[in-house]
Amino acid sequence: MPPIKRQPRGWVLPGYRYLGPFNPLDNGEPVNNADRAAQLHDHAYSELIKSGKNPYLYFNKADEKFIDDLKDDWSIGGIIGSSFFKIKRAVAPALGNKERAQKRHFYFANSNKGAKKTKKSEPKPGTSKMSDTDIQDQQPDTVDAPQNTSGGGTGSIGGGKGSGVGISTGGWVGGSHFSDKYVVTKNTRQFITTIQNGHLYKTEAIETTNQSGKSQRCVTTPWTYFNFNQYSCHFSPQDWQRLTNEYKRFRPKAMQVKIYNLQIKQILSNGADTTYNNDLTAGVHIFCDGEHAYPNASHPWDEDVMPDLPYKTWKLFQYGYIPIENELADLDGNAAGGNATEKALLYQMPFFLLENSDHQVLRTGESTEFTFNFDCEWVNNERAYIPPGLMFNPKVPTRRVQYIRQNGSTAASTGRIQPYSKPTSWMTGPGLLSAQRVGPQSSDTAPFMVCTNPEGTHINTGAAGFGSGFDPPNGCLAPTNLEYKLQWYQTPEGTGNNGNIIANPSLSMLRDQLLYKGNQTTYNLVGDIWMFPNQVWDRFPITRENPIWCKKPRADKHTIMDPFDGSIAMDHPPGTIFIKMAKIPVPTASNADSYLNIYCTGQVSCEIVWEVERYATKNWRPERRHTALGMSLGGESNYTPTYHVDPTGAYIQPTSYDQCMPVKTNINKVL
């Protein structure tokens, strides 16, 4: 029989019916959302051709609609189709669209060609429909950063993307997506930054009221910065509850930050009146220190992190750093003239100017993006229900015997160990418990101080004056004094009072362990435990209020990294994103250094992909979970529950450790 006459299908992607050129308008039912968007795109092209226009040579409204239709589609076809027409938008002339041509002009005027990123490193809004495969595919693979990193956080100097005045460069993103392998958190905040230090670098002396305490020398800069280093910045209380109730471990994998919808305004004062005008020519300097070339800014537990509540304005903190240990270089030796050692240290004091790096200068209506990759360990959420020394069957006799020394006598005997008391090879972790904090109450000391005292320097204070206090390295040892318990302030909003939260004893049997040694008559506590073979312990349990990471110091050698607060030690955490107002000089009759008084506000969004593992258990009994039960009441009239707002708008923050929902309290693990 003669062959069936088939209609040509066009140059479509394999498995698709419309995603490609030259296919017929009626080629069957679209296979997915990307194919359906391509079908509508083909019909729009057909109408343009009928009107006498060539849509293949010009970027047009049909192309713009196609890109918009695929903004939430992360299938392979959607990525390829969207990428193709984004390239066309950047290089092809607009088809009778002056607004689009103006946007192209801003794109080329402000883009950084050396920092172009692949499709996979672009921001990923709209993750509510993502599957595990989609989320994995959308993670950044490579970033064109100015440094070569072998994992950890990297930052790219993304091109400034302009859309002109009155054209939005992005929408507000928020919410979280939970799946079996990945969790995606999305948050947006309104930020504001102002002129710092009159555009100058200055050295400030920070003195304490305690004369024998620590003094510091700080270099303050014209720059401010963004800090995303806290779990509460990314997880709502309900999201954190779900994460800690359903997953046995998690870790960050990729982070994308977008700064957009910039509005630069000039402050004009005329007597008692103040007006705020849009300034379309002023700019802000923005760059990311992806190679960690400047002193670290995102120290754990700082108060400058992104606000918990999405409607709160984020007032960026000024960036400053310590250039030298002040007590070692204050030139108070040799009768206050300074000795050779002090001068040698002072001569080598560094001075970091952030303007010494390439960066963008963005104007009103423009935007920029930064991408980071993480290479870090997991945060484990399982608790040990028994210590490792009880990993045995207590009904089965053991062949082990022990040597027993009789009380008050040199006589000894040998006895068989009972089945329920078998010895173990597993020892508690290392730690130090033999120190206490030095008073008085106004002192800024710590239980342990690390001091650097080069020979020849003149020291006229105690150890607190030239030492650095650090959290007691307790490993998994149980706190014997209050100094060893993690504490932090949780200030109730609007009260001005400091609410002190103290970490509770852990519910995991691989934490809060103690080592005792026998002396023939009793057992005594061992306060200092060094590192030995066969020590096993769990890391400190974190809460929603904890920092995510801490930066490892660049050192030749180090032992096992186990930060006291449970944060993740990273060689390359996300680089700090710095921002400052551009200096706009104005002429004066006296030739004084004068400039326009401006500030900048805009939106900053942060999206993090978290790798997760759901828990699986053979435990028959129900387990403990974080719930709303047990939350306290506060606020005006004392009837507003935690994580809610009272009639005055004050947000009721947690007042106890359990309300912060710590990990390692719910899911049991088999050792």
From Swiss-Prot:
Keyword check for Lyase: no
UniProt motif Nuclear localization signal: location: 614-625
Compositionally biased residues, Polar residues: 136-149
Mutagenesis / variant outcome for changing residue 63 to A: Almost complete loss of phospholipase A2-like activity
Top EC category: hydrolase
Segments of this protein annotated with the region Disordered: 106-161
Record annotation: effect of changing residue 42 to N: Almost complete loss of phospholipase A2-like activity
InterPro entries: Capsid/spike_ssDNA_virus, Parvovirus_coat, Phospholipase_A2-like, VP1/VP2
Domain of life, source organism: Viruses
E.C. designation(s): 3.1.1.4
Stretches for region Phospholipase A2-like: 11-66
Alphabetical UniProt keywords: Capsid protein, Host cytoplasm, Host nucleus, Hydrolase, Lipid degradation, Lipid metabolism, T=1 icosahedral capsid protein, Virion
Catalysis: reaction(s): a 1,2-diacyl-sn-glycero-3-phosphocholine + H2O = a 1-acyl-sn-glycero-3-phosphocholine + a fatty acid + H(+)
Gene Ontology terms: cellular component: host cell cytoplasm; host cell nucleus; T=1 icosahedral viral capsid; viral capsid
Gene Ontology MF annotations: phospholipase A2 activity; structural molecule activity
Reported impact of residue 21 to R: Almost complete loss of phospholipase A2-like activity
GO biological process, one term: lipid catabolic process
Protein family according to the UniProt entry: Belongs to the parvoviridae capsid protein family.
Free-text comment about domains: The N-terminus of Isoform Minor capsid protein VP1, VP1u, contains a phospholipase A2-like region. VP1u may play a role in the disruption of host tight junctions in the airway tract.
Subunit structure comment from the entry: Heteromultimer of isoform Minor capsid protein VP1, isoform Minor capsid protein VP2 and isoform Major capsid protein VP3. Isoform Major capsid protein VP3 is a homomultimer. Isoform Major capsid protein VP3 is 10 fold more abundant than the minor capsid proteins VP1 and VP2.
Annotated function: Capsid proteins self-assembles to form an icosahedral capsid with a T=1 symmetry, about 26 nm in diameter, and consisting of 60 copies of three size variants of the capsid proteins, VP1, and VP3, which differ by the presence of an N-terminal extension in the minor protein VP1. The capsid has a channel at the 5-fold axis and there are densities extending the 5-fold axis into the interior of the capsid. The capsid encapsulates the genomic ssDNA.
Name used for this protein in its record: Minor capsid protein VP1
The organism of origin for this protein: Primate bocaparvovirus 1 (strain Human bocavirus 1 type 1) (HBoV1)
